[in-house]
C-alpha cells in the first residue's frame, strides 16, 4: 500500500529533545522501581492527575510549551498529589526489600515455576473433588488418551470437561466442539475464591 511512498527517517529522541528542550535521564533501574510503585499506588490514574486524553484537547494552545503551561496553571496540585502517592509506596517497598533474602527468593521461584505452572491442573482436581463429594461419588483425572477426547476427568462414571468462563466467549472457530458435559469456573485475579458453575446430570 505504501510501496510508492517516500520514507523519511528521523531520530525521534533527538527531535523530542529539540521540542521539550531537555532529555530527562534517570539512574539505571530507578524508572523500573518508580513504575512498579506507581502501578501499586495508582498515582497517575485519571482520578489523580486527570483524564489526559481529554485535557490535552481542552488546552487551547496546541504546542508542547502551551500544554505544559496550561496544565501546570490549572492542575499543578495533581502533580504533587501523584508524587506523594508514589513516594509513599516507594517507602513501603523499601521496607519490603528489607524482608527479602535468598530463601524468600527461592520460595518465590519455586512457587512460580512449579505451583503456578500446575495451577490449571490443581483447579481441575479441586473442582472434580468438590462436585464428586457433593454427589457422594468417586472422581479421577483423565488419562492422556481420554484428554485427546476433550475429557478432563470423571465424576462417578460421567466424563466431564473443565473450562474457564472465558472459554464461553471465544468465537466458535476458536472454541472446540465438545459433546460431553462441561463444568465452567472463574478465578478472578488476586482473589482467593474459585467459582464453579455446572448443571451436571449425575
Curated annotation (Swiss-Prot):
It comes from the Archaea. One of its GO terms (biological process) is DNA restriction-modification system. The keyword Plastid does not apply. This is Type II restriction enzyme MthZI. One of its GO terms (molecular function) is DNA binding. The keyword Hydrolase applies. It holds the Pfam family RE_MjaI. It is an enzyme of class 3 (hydrolase). It catalyses: Endonucleolytic cleavage of DNA to give specific double-stranded fragments with terminal 5'-phosphates. Keywords: Endonuclease, Hydrolase, Nuclease, Plasmid, Restriction system. It comes from Methanothermobacter thermautotrophicus. InterPro entries: Restrct_endonuc_II_MjaI. Its EC number is 3.1.21.4.
Amino acid at each position: 500500500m505504501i510501496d510508492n511512498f517516500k520514507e523519511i527517517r528521523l531520530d525521534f529522541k533527538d527531535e523530542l529533545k529539540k521540542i521539550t528542550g531537555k532529555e530527562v535521564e534517570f539512574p539505571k533501574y530507578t524508572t523500573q522501581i518508580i513504575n512498579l510503585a506507581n502501578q501499586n499506588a495508582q498515582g497517575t490514574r485519571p482520578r489523580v492527575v486527570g483524564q489526559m486524553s481529554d485535557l490535552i484537547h481542552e488546552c487551547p494552545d496546541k504546542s508542547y510549551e502551551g500544554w505544559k503551561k496550561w496544565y501546570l496553571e490549572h492542575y499543578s496540585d495533581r502533580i504533587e498529589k501523584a508524587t506523594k502517592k508514589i513516594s509513599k509506596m516507594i517507602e513501603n517497598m523499601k521496607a519490603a526489600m528489607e524482608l527479602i533474602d535468598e530463601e524468600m527468593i527461592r520460595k518465590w521461584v519455586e512457587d512460580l515455576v512449579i505451583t503456578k505452572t500446575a495451577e490449571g491442573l490443581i483447579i481441575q482436581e479441586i473442582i472434580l473433588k468438590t462436585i464428586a463429594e457433593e454427589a457422594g461419588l468417586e472422581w479421577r483425572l483423565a488419562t492422556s488418551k481420554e484428554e485427546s477426547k476433550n475429557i478432563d476427568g470423571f465424576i462417578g462414571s460421567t466424563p466431564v470437561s473443565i473450562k474457564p468462563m472465558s472459554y464461553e466467549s471465544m468465537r466458535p472457530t476458536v472454541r472446540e466442539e465438545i459433546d460431553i458435559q462441561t463444568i465452567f469456573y472463574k478465578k478472578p485475579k488476586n482473589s482467593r475464591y474459585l467459582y464453579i458453575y455446572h448443571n451436571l446430570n449425575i
